[in-house]
Amino acid sequence: MAGPGARKSNASNTPQDKKMKGDSIQDQKNKQYNSGDVVEPFVSDAMAKNSKQLLYAHIYNYLVHNQHHDTAKKFLQEANVPLSKAVPQHSLNGDKLLNSKMLMNSPDTFLFEWWQSLWALNQYVETTPIENLTSLKPFNDRIVPILPQVPPQEMLSRVVRTGPIAPAMGFAGNIVPQQQQQQQQQQQQQLQQQQQQQQHFRTMTSPGSGNTPYATNANSFPAGVRVPQPQGSFQPVLGTTPNAGTNAGLGVNPYHAATLGSSKSTPKPQNTSVGSKNKQTKKSSATNKDSGANTKPRANGESKQFKGVNSSSKVKKPSPSGSQQVQANWTKLQQKQQQQQQQQQQQQQQQQQQQQQQQQHQQQQQHQQQQQHQQQQQHQQQQQQIRMQYQKMMTLMQHQQNQQNQQHHQLGNQNILPGQGDPSDNSSPSQQYLQQQRAYENMVKSQQQDQPMNKDHFAMSLQTQQPQSFDSYAMPATMGPQASSQPLDNNKKSEPLSKIDVTNNQDFNTFSGGSNNKLNFGQFDMSGLGNEFMGGRKQ
């Protein structure tokens, strides 16, 4: 049987009851949007079952708020938007819009506000120079954890309340100077963190087994405990192991206030000793001597340690904390992005240079082609000019040759004697005369063959004469004037007929001793030749 002090089990504290209570609370929240009075369903983020439906609800609310009605209808039909009550999918045919009631909402919709905040953060990171981000003070200063602190007055009051501890260290009711208080306040935060890390090293041992030179009292560690130095980034400072001096000057550790409170109820070392009073007095005097002997070297050691702390704080820096590592990673990422951007810019510049070189090469080729085309045109023009000049020269040469031929023809015609015509003209009377003369010679030859015995002096003279060329100016002795032995000058004009002695010429119709009737020249009428060839040339 259970006693009267036994508790009765509360049915409301069971897990099942808690779950039912949570469901009822959720139902109460949804009732304000899913009441029975509302006939048509509506879109609400309170009915979202997962993050995707929550996003769909806010997207739909954003579209309706900004009057994108067609897009909202299509989105309501295609997306799984959370509704206040179950509706068949075929009923959402895209003809009507549903109202939206959102728990998380704002004047410009929650989706827009959320995106605006992200965009502002992104713009700040993009527009702020990297130097300003890396030179922020919180990332470079020493980070000291914020711990509960005890005001100096309370610490002094606690020190005074300890009783025999203060006179043992020589602080008999004296006030600590201000300089020491400032130094103690600066070191208090470091001591609190170190003491928190050293809690697992604090164990109780026998008083005689320790080698530490520090004095012991009711509020200090046991003499046998050696406190190791912390392995953190902070430098060792005075008072790593609490003792009478530290308790007197720095106050009571706030984490061990309970031990101090319990020390009042616990018997003091003088009351707990079992031996005689003499032994107790000897022991107390020994402890006082040890404490007095230890105060002097510790004072010197404190000054040295303070110097070491100040110097080390200037030289050594704390190890990077989590925020510094994040900042370092951020700077590395920014540097990588800058390097990538620089590489991309270099690649773009190289591509632009290549394109410019290609364009220059194409322009040079086009210029060369134009020059070649111009040279070809010039060459063709020169050839045409040369041909035209050659044709002109040929025409001039032909014209000059024709003129020379005409002049030569004229000069040759001037040297023709009277009675001779132009030898090139076959139709002239002179040519007819020569033909008649040849016909006559042929006739004479035929008569000589028929009558060899009948000799004719005129015929004999004709046979002895050689045929002369048309250009010869010598006349036979029997015809006209006798030829002289001197050669005729071609450039010399023929003498006029007035100077010719006509008396020496014989009549062609009457010859002496001509007995043959065929030799009568009456049939060759040459009376008209005198007028045509009187000047040696056809008029």
From Swiss-Prot:
Residues 200-220, 230-246, 260-294, 423-452, 501-517 have a biased composition (Polar residues). This is Transcription activator MSS11. Residues 178-199, 307-323, 398-415 have a biased composition (Low complexity). Belongs to the MSS11 family. The keyword Transcription regulation applies. It is found in: Cytoplasm; Nucleus. Residues 1-33, 177-331, 396-452, 477-517 are annotated as: Disordered. The keyword Transcription regulation applies. GO terms for cellular component: cytoplasm; nucleus. Transcription factor that regulates pseudohyphal differentiation, invasive growth, floculation, adhesion and starch metabolism in response to nutrient availability. Residues 16-30 have a biased composition (Basic and acidic residues). It comes from Kluyveromyces lactis (strain ATCC 8585 / CBS 2359 / DSM 70799 / NBRC 1267 / NRRL Y-1140 / WM37) (Yeast). Residues 51-83 form the LisH domain. GO terms for biological process: regulation of biosynthetic process. Keywords: Activator, Cytoplasm, Nucleus, Transcription, Transcription regulation. InterPro entries: LisH (IPR006594). PROSITE patterns: LISH.
